[in-house]
């Protein structure tokens, strides 16, 4: 029978590396979206189209207290969703504990003209002077990753 160290190894939550793409269908553009996760939980951020909000076009894992820039986003309008939680389950493509689901209320509009392209910065944590509003969504409303 193993000691306490063996028990602790077994119950360590599973975490992917920041920047791990779970879905990557938005290649070929110039747009950029920097996402800062200043919260104490890991996140999976998802971009989907307003026409088909339940179908993820991009999904990337961002660890707690970390940030990541998604590059190469093609022109279009997208909704930004995110799930927060602990202990990622790669089979079910979801967090197993403390899971919450949210969506930014404003759509993101990416446009490229000549050498100019759209960049956004989104913070998942509240910031002083921040203008973006989020709203909770149910697991059923959240884009599926399976």
Model-derived features: positions:
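Short Pro-Gly-centered beta-turn/loop motif in secreted/extracellular proteins
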Residues: 69-77
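Tight coil/turn sites that cap or link beta-strands
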Residues: 63-65
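Primarily secretory-pathway and cell-envelope proteins
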Residues: 1-58, 83-146
């Amino acid at each position: 029978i193993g000691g306490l160290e063996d028990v602790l190894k077994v119950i360590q939550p599973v975490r992917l590396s920041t920047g791990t793409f779970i879905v990557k269908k938005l290649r070929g553009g110039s747009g950029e979206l920097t996402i800062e996760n200043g919260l104490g939980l890991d996140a999976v951020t998802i971009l989907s189209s307003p026409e088909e909000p339940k179908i993820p076009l991009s999904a990337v894992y961002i660890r707690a207290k970390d940030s990541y820039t998604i590059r190469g986003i093609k022109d279009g309008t997208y909704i930004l969703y995110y799930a927060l939680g602990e202990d990622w389950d790669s089979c079910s493509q979801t967090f197993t504990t403390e899971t919450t689901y949210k969506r930014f209320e404003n759509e993101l509009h990416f446009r490229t003209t000549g050498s100019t392209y759209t960049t956004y910065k989104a913070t998942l944590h509240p910031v002083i002077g921040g203008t973006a509003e989020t709203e909770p969504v149910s697991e059923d409303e959240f884009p599926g990753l399976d």
